């Protein structure tokens, strides 16, 4: 007999496990099919910045969605610990977006429309982070842009979903999705299962399944390289950010530095040139990092869409098939809101119309960010 579920989620990264968790919490019989290990692809490669403001300079639909997701982490920190027993290691302190030039300053001043952003002059920056690099003209201080440990969040979502009754199948790649009377049939390497709904949440690898279900949307890999070092005692409380590079302090005593952006590269191994670029940028923000011992280097593939924004919604011609993929640099940040939105759509709960319109697959223009 085929296994039958309310919903099958295809993909066990932070997006897929968030969807499964929110559905299981609502009492839905849910399964996750993951081709490898849960959270071992793009999720494990991320630094975990909840940088709603780092990714958006102005208010708009994307920013509102990102802020809603960012705020959800406050609730989830305790909730996931209670249900799963896992601490997602949410770290307060915020982000300092640094200005080293007048053009940097002018760009950062454009964020003044956001009431959650505070401009600091150079002396105020050095009071907060006395070990920051020389030549800083000022910074935007964003208290709400905290960070979490992505692998811990994904494990917490997955274990939480299991505790609430979901099945999570690892090393179970999905081969096909087909609609039949009253159900969706999902065939994997381990057999066939049926569900009322199926959600494609496989990151950059979602393209093949999109093609199967008749959606002419592509996902483009953007390789991101990172490294971590062991902090030998230099004080750093807040994340430092400049020129698309960040230094994130971890509870473990490590500092995470990331991330490069290499479009079209499917290779998941870090390269010397990319790591060299990160070290150069990190030294300008925190000179003392030069003497720190390297812990490890790694890379992951971000899933980029044609306009840089995710596809979150229903198949335009089949209400039983949904998707949540293409989160690019923002998978960790957007995981809670994406999970809630998918669950609400499946449960028939209200969802903001502007979110549906902004992230539907058949949209014609990019979301204003």
UniProtKB/Swiss-Prot annotation:
Changing residue 81 to R: Shows 7.1- and 8-fold increase of affinity and catalytic efficiency to glyphosate, respectively, while the substrate affinity to glycine decreases 235-fold and catalytic efficiency decreases 113-fold. The keyword tRNA-binding does not apply. Changing residue 54 to R: Shows 7.1- and 8-fold increase of affinity and catalytic efficiency to glyphosate, respectively, while the substrate affinity to glycine decreases 235-fold and catalytic efficiency decreases 113-fold. Keywords: FAD, Flavoprotein, Oxidoreductase, Thiamine biosynthesis. Pathway: Cofactor biosynthesis; thiamine diphosphate biosynthesis. It catalyses: glycine + O2 + H2O = glyoxylate + H2O2 + NH4(+); glyphosate + O2 + H2O = aminomethylphosphonate + glyoxylate + H2O2 + H(+); N-ethylglycine + O2 + H2O = ethylamine + glyoxylate + H2O2; sarcosine + O2 + H2O = methylamine + glyoxylate + H2O2. Belongs to the DAO family. ThiO subfamily. This is Glycine oxidase. It comes from Bacillus licheniformis. The gene is thiO.
């Amino acid at each position: 007999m085929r296994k039958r579920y309310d919903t099958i989620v295809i993909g066990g990264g932070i997006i897929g496990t968030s969807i499964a968790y929110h559905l299981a919490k609502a009492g839905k019989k849910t399964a996750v099919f993951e081709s490898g290990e849960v959270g071992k692809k793009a999720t494990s490669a991320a630094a975990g910045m909840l940088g709603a403001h780092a990714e958006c300079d102005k208010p708009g639909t994307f920013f509102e969605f990102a802020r809603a997701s960012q705020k959800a982490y406050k609730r989830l920190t305790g909730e996931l610990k209670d249900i799963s027993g896992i601490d997602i290691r949410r770290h307060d302190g915020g982000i300092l977006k640094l200005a080293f030039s007048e053009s940097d300053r002018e760009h950062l001043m454009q964020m003044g429309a956001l009431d959650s952003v505070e401009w600091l002059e150079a002396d105020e920056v050095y009071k907060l982070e006395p070990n920051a690099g020389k030549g800083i003209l000022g910074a935007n201080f964003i208290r709400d842009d905290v960070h979490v440990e992505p692998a811990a969040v994904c494990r917490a979502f997955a274990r939480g979903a299991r505790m609430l009754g979901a099945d999570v199948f690892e090393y179970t790649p999905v081969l096909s999705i087909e609609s039949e009377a009253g159900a969706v049939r999902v065939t994997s390497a381990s057999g066939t299962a049926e569900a009322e709904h199926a959600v494609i949440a496989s990151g950059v690898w979602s393209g093949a399944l999109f093609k199967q279900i008749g959606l002419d949307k592509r996902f483009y890999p953007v390789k991101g390289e990172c490294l971590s070092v062991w902090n030998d005692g230099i004080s750093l409380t807040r994340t430092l950010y400049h020129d698309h590079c960040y230094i994130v302090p971890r509870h473990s005593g490590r500092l995470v530095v990331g991330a490069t952006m290499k479009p079209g590269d499917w290779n998941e191994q870090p390269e010397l040139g990319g790591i060299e670029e990160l070290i150069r940028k990190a030294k300008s923000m925190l000179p003392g990092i030069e003497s720190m011992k390297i812990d490890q280097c790694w890379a992951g593939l971000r899933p980029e869409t044609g306009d840089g924004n995710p596809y979150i919604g229903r198949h335009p011609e089949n209400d039983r098939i949904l998707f949540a993929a293409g989160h690019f640099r923002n998978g960790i940040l957007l995981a809670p809101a994406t999970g809630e939105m998918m669950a609400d759509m499946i449960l028939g709960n209200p969802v903001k119309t502007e979110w549906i319109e902004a992230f539907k697959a058949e949209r014609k223009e990019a979301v204003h960010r």
